[in-house]
Amino acid sequence: MKPLAAPANHGVLGQQEKQSLPADFTKLHLTDSLHPQVTHVSSSHSGCSITSDSGSSSLSDIYQATESEAGDMDLSGLPETAVDSEDDDDEEDIERASDPLMSRDIVRDCLEKDPIDRTDDDIEQLLEFMHQLPAFANMTMSVRRELCAVMVFAVVERAGTIVLNDGEELDSWSVILNGSVEVTYPDGKAEILCMGNSFGVSPTMDKEYMKGVMRTKVDDCQFVCIAQQDYCRILNQVEKNMQKVEEEGEIVMVKEHRELDRTGTRKGHIVIKGTSERLTMHLVEEHSVVDPTFIEDFLLTYRTFLSSPMEVGKKLLEWFNDPSLRDKVTRVVLLWVNNHFNDFEGDPAMTRFLEEFENNLEREKMGGHLRLLNIACAAKAKRRLMTLTKPSREAPLPFILLGGSEKGFGIFVDSVDSCSKATEAGLKRGDQILEVNGQNFENIQLSKAMEILRNNTHLSITVKTNLFVFKELLTRLSEEKRNGAPHLPKIGDIKKASRYSIPDLAVDVEQVIGLEKVNKKSKANTVGGRNKLKKILDKTRISILPQKPYNDIGIGQSQDDSIVGLRQTKHIPAALPVSGTLSSSNPDLLQSHHRILDFSTTPDLPDQVLRVFKADQQSRYIMISKDTTAKEVVIQAIREFAVTATPEQYSLCEVSVTPEGVIKQRRLPDQLSKLADRIQLSGRYYLKNNMETETLCSDEDAQELLRESQISLLQLSTVEVATQLSMRNFELFRNIEPTEYIDDLFKLKSKTSCANLKKFEEVINQETFWVASEILRETNQLKRMKIIKHFIKIALHCRECKNFNSMFAIISGLNLAPVARLRTTWEKLPNKYEKLFQDLQDLFDPSRNMAKYRNVLSGQNLQPPVIPLFPVIKKDLTFLHEGNDSKVDGLVNFEKLRMIAKEIRHVGRMASVNMDPALMFRTRKKKWRSLGSLSQGSANATVLDVAQTGGHKKRVRRSSFLNAKKLYEDAQMARKVKQYLSNLELEMDEESLQTLSLQCEPATSTLPKNPGDKKPVKSETSPVAPRAGPQQKVQPQQPLAQPQPPHKVSQGLQVPAVSLYPSRKKVPVKDLPPFGINSPQALKKILSLSEEGSLERHRKQAEDTISNASSQLSSPPTSPQSSPRKGYALALSGTVDNFSDSGHSEISSRSSIVSNSSFDSVPVSLHDERRQRHSVSIVESNLGVGRMERRTLMEPDQYSLGSYAPVSESRGLYAAATVISSPSTEELSHDQGDRASLDAADSGRGSWTSCSSGSHDNIQTIQHQRSWETLPFGHTHFDYSGDAASIWASGGHMDQMMFSDHSTKYNRQNQSRESLEQAQSRASWASSTGYWGEDSEGDTGTIKRRGGKDVSAEAESSSMVPVTTEEAKPVPMPAHIAVTPSTTKGLIARKEGRYREPPPTPPGYVGIPIADFPEGPCHPARKPPDYNVALQRSRMVARPTEAPAPGQTPPAAAASRPGSKPQWHKPSDADPRLAPFQPQGFAGAEEDEDEQVSAV
């Protein structure tokens, strides 16, 4: 189940303040399967593909060129044109990624259908989308489903439109999906309703009237409306569907009758709520077909309403005595042990319960069930490490052992002295000893084991409960006593069972194979003998196992989910067996196959290589397996070296060199295994003659060893780094117990304290700061660029490994402000890597609740292992928890718990693999050319996956026999990577990173300081938006804005990817009648809104769809936004600092994690009444001015996924000039607006944690800075009445929980610094990087001027998460700021050292100077051509080396913009609008310099 709500950004109704609301519903649509009808999923459909779907990866050349077999060769110095033929492919792929197909908004499509045309699938889509809105809180799923079936979609385009008048009769119940409305009551009070809130009739047919006047606050408000009659019918029908169970006059349980489809075949009663006692009793009652997962859901979530598991345990033992309930009780216990064995381990009371239950099963002769129980315990038991010390070697052992390889078993504990230290350490009967002091005990003779245990006083013992095999051992021993001879079973001894469940098959076959091997080579019959078993399972899996493989259910859906009636949207070939498919009497005991068949053990084939030296420094490569012992290696080495001696005369020694140069030598025990994993980089294995005392390693060799062990990132293979990261992440992810999610979510105390969950949470921080630390510690600029390139490649490989967590962390690290500001370093990055990086960022586009990422995650080809982005998981769970009450009418709300359990099951399924994940990641990395695509979107990727995890793997192994040296070098690279990752020194302090960044590329200041300015303490610590293309220097004394010739730019990083979704512009509806019933018929207005919206949407789709490629390949220096417009800059007393590049283009970080600073240009069609505006540029007089000591208060949302970089710091840096005065309200299409995320750039603190669903969180509320617009002339009026914190919607707060350590560090210590300069400096900033088309998004919490009216944002806060009072203190702001007419026409400039020059202007986009353009409404004919078209033309037109002279119009420009008179304009010194800036040394620039200022 995939909850799709996102963190809140708007106000909530009344007591629902604690509930979080989705940020923007257009950003929150479902992405389960964009194209169910498409079998060939092209890269554009995948949402993240950077390659084509042609069947051979367009990136293969990169990997051929850069991933040499021995490691990673850097060929960046070679001429790119000759080698990098994939450039063209990449460009083509990036263009394909902007395929309009990607813009399908499934939920929107479903909403726009006529209700009678909606299918069951459509209703499920809407249900999943709507079910977390506060308006639907505490409604049952069936009521929500009914409402979704009849709802009508309506859109009100303009802000300020009256929706309902006071006293108007209401005819519907409506829910706001996007935007916000304000209700003004007759007494003057006002209330703001935001996304997720509802208004309208109550569920009666009585006439009701509107109180107050309702107006839209923002453009593009979207509603769903349910007619009064339907609403009344559905809600009243609920009562009829409810079955209330009463005891002694009190309601103890409420069930609801549900029909899961329209066929009527799946219907029954499902538990909605009940008392804890009654819910427990329901465990052994009959469950209907619509509630198949009640037991699993209960066993996972009982801890939220019961204080102890023994409350359930006692009842189960009591019910076991009732023969009619016995089978059901047994099933519950089996499921409990199988799903949550951690409830029993370490809990003495529960362990006793389990023992008592086993005794009951034995007493009742329920052998089959007992066997299943033992299998489950063995499969689910965790390894435990305990340390024992003996006073002396002669001291007796406090336990008795059984087994040994001579009997075909491992070493088991038969009894433990009751008062010994071993008992205290947790050793108990039935434990299998796996390892002692590093020596493997799984295949060892009992006498040898006893010898090792006796000869050591310090014992580090790894054990695991394995009652199943222990009981087999006891049975065997008793048989031997009776028969007087050891019994070696043959294959025919397999128990003749009529039917094998998965566990039966697995362990029986395993047992036989293990015992059969005894004659040939002693092999423990533990959960081992596993390799042949796996082969048999591989061959028999599809035919023997129940036929419900992934092609029926997929990762996101188990058998139980499909019964419950969830859509089956994922079609995955039948490659892997799946849990949850056994009959109800034999519950699935192999939910995670690796748990029972220890799949983490690699095959028993010689797939590892050791390099063994002799004293004369000769060496040989020896093939071994993981279980090969040191003694066996000696035998092989003697054979390889052709030594004529017996193995007893030689031993294996490990020689290692410490960092100080000390040579250490030790003899390895004969039984030591896992030799390939134990050797260090600074160590070697030597074959030593026991009779001689020769020096094995000379000082020179030791120095060489030491040198080899010193590694840097650039020496490492990117494929191997990605593989190791993925293995490490997957191991952490797989170890998270389902109960940990519950404990963490409900803040429950548990014995494990969610340790695994915390580790997985923390890894994303570590990897983010690892990237920044590695880059910023490199002083050489060229090497720094290579490191960036290296990380981009690692992120690409992480995507190939489906490791989204590390991929996101690396992207976030590259976007941390200290890294992002390294302009000259980024300029050196080859274009293809910029484009690849852009594409990687695009996958994590936060808009629409991370729709692109979710698309990929739920894609048809995605099989486990998958490492999902953890903050998204956490956000989804938090929404379910906080959006629904835990108790309703005094009863436990089990419907809520069922939703949470389903989400946790879905997450857990991503980690359920049936083979060693290391092997999966490794085979994956070999398949570039066959897979066809780096993304998971390639049509035949899955089939190839399946084929190649078998076939290709063998090919690798076959070649390894031929080339042991190659295999050794691969293993050595893996060792290097492991050592590198384990020895990382991370710089987690942002201040230190910023200092390092300034040392790499010092800040430069070329502009004089304004005398009246108060300079902040630091001028250059502010994080900046990522690179924006090479810039040209501003020369202080040259006239402003000389025409600049277009320059070649690096194309990938300068512009964030533009939205791939079409804009949702709707025709203005100011002339439509209001919502009320004065329309000729009920709902007429709603329907007309809906229809008109739909028509307009299709009409404008082509016009407004923006090409992803356009943003990456070219962004004009002059403003191509619609027609010319005036962007009035506020240059108050020189405080305008750090403007975005020439103020010309759309702020749209569709894909950037920290948005890039050169903006996308978005064509927007204008209406006649639209005012002409120009973006103009001003140059700041002093680099430090307005630069605050902004170690900002991290609000919960600044940790939100939407706000990839907390914006508070640098939002101010893009000064007011980019804010556009908007008397008209159609500035940008909605979608473009809501993707226009900031050029964000805080230090990136929090960029990784992001969890918010809406990209407009990015620009949502700039902490302590309000976005305001200047009036065309005169004063700008501030109406700041909201407190700073409340403006943010804090849906991302769960990340604050996750990563709170990092945020609080700054919260307190910097408040004082914050306030010092707010009054002087913050007041003069416009947080311009809010939206360019800010009118289209009302939830940004900014104060807007629409249609000449100031709109205050104070109540738009709506966070479900309460903001603490400390964080929510209002910040003093000046009430008025004087803006003179001259300052309002200031110009934007970019500060040197932060931005790069914008890309060349496509033909057809030429700036129109202010002086030459008349004020007032524009001519309707003035409209730019489609930007994509212009862009395509620009590629075919030779770029001039000289800028056109004033008065000249390029022919393409003239042709493409009829009616306009574009020309370059050099403002005269006398131009009054520039007067205030003349003394500040505004400069034009020469073409060969680094920063460019363009005046439009």
Curated annotation (Swiss-Prot):
Tell me if Lipid biosynthesis is a UniProt keyword of this record. no
Where composition is biased (Polar residues), the residues are 1246-1256, 1306-1330
Molecular function terms, GO-annotated: beta-1 adrenergic receptor binding; cAMP binding; GTPase activator activity; guanyl-nucleotide exchange factor activity; PDZ domain binding; WW domain binding
- Domain Ras-associating: from-to ranges: 606-692
* Annotated region (Disordered), positions in chain: 40-59, 68-101, 1002-1051, 1093-1159, 1224-1256, 1303-1369, 1390-1496
Entry-annotated residues carrying Phosphothreonine: T644
Q: What domain of life is recorded for the organism?
A: Eukaryota
Report the main location listed first in the record: cytoplasm
Report residues binding a nucleoside 3',5'-cyclic phosphate. Answer: 135-254
PDZ domain sequence ranges: 385-470
User: What are the protein's UniProt keywords?
Assistant: Cell junction, Cell membrane, Cytoplasm, Developmental protein, Differentiation, Endosome, GTPase activation, Guanine-nucleotide releasing factor, Membrane, Neurogenesis, Phosphoprotein, Ubl conjugation
Q: Which residues fall in a compositionally biased region of kind Basic and acidic residues?
A: 1227-1237
Q: How does it assemble?
A: Found in a complex, at least composed of KIDINS220, MAGI2, NTRK1 and RAPGEF2; the complex is mainly formed at late endosomes in a neuronal growth factor (NGF)-dependent manner. Interacts (via C-terminal domain) with NEDD4 (via WW domains); this interaction leads to ubiquitination and degradation via the proteasome pathway in a cAMP-independent manner. Interacts with MAGI1 (via PDZ domain). Interacts with ADRB1 (via C-terminal PDZ motif); the interaction is direct. Interacts (via Ras-associating domain) with RAP1A (via GTP-bound active form).
What role does it play?
Functions as a guanine nucleotide exchange factor (GEF), which activates Rap and Ras family of small GTPases by exchanging bound GDP for free GTP in a cAMP-dependent manner. Serves as a link between cell surface receptors and Rap/Ras GTPases in intracellular signaling cascades. Also acts as an effector for Rap1 by direct association with Rap1-GTP thereby leading to the amplification of Rap1-mediated signaling. Shows weak activity on HRAS. It is controversial whether RAPGEF2 binds cAMP and cGMP or not.
Record family assignment: Belongs to the RAPGEF2 family.
Task: Give the domain section of the comments.
Answer: The Ras-associating domain is necessary for the Rap guanine nucleotide exchange activity. The N-terminal regionis necessary for cAMP-binding. The PDZ domain is necessary for its targeting to the cell membrane.
Instruction: Give the protein name, as stated in the record.
Output: Rap guanine nucleotide exchange factor 2
Annotated source species: Mus musculus (Mouse)
